[in-house]
């Protein structure tokens, strides 16, 4: 078995975050990642698409984190951006937005589902997430910047969603949510923090390796991929 490849699929660069793509990608590579997804919020996109630095050993994937409270408008944004990004995230935080995201198979990841006194998920939404293969994110940054009761509440919400994910076989993605270079943590540190949140070692490892790779494979199909509605004919069947 080869060495696992680690990915951080929620990183924000200027003008959304504090650092440039080059600065973030250089540090992420130094920390041991094989790739990151640039996922600026949709209301803080740069005027022009920055060049995404990539090599054979490290890649910056094009992504977006959609911010929209109206479910109908959210679906419109999903349709607008889906074909142009590798990673499409919805910023949750209300029951209506969470439901709209988890019921849409074109969404890759739901971030920040919690709201008020709710973890943001329930049995119905967890089933939708599993059926539509929408992953739930576990973001490290809020834990690093919180103390006292707020951190207790964050951990409680994470563990509640983790229980639902286990019960209904929902995919998890472990990300930094970095708004600056100071928010990035090495894969080993991230895995250790995930275990503090209640993830088993194999669950945390899958959330930072296997699930991100599956998202990219789904959105960047290889030459053998057959698009829906296209029939493959065997030799001699062309008449």
From Swiss-Prot:
Its EC number is 3.1.26.5. GO terms for molecular function: ribonuclease P activity; RNA binding. GO terms for cellular component: cytoplasm; ribonuclease P complex. SUPFAM superfamilies: PHP domain-like. The keyword Cell division does not apply. Keywords: Cytoplasm, Endonuclease, Hydrolase, Nuclease, tRNA processing. Part of ribonuclease P, a protein complex that generates mature tRNA molecules by cleaving their 5'-ends. HAMAP family: RNase_P_3 (MF_00756). Consists of a catalytic RNA component and at least 4-5 protein subunits. Belongs to the eukaryotic/archaeal RNase P protein component 3 family. This is Ribonuclease P protein component 3. It comes from Methanosarcina barkeri (strain Fusaro / DSM 804). The gene is rnp3.
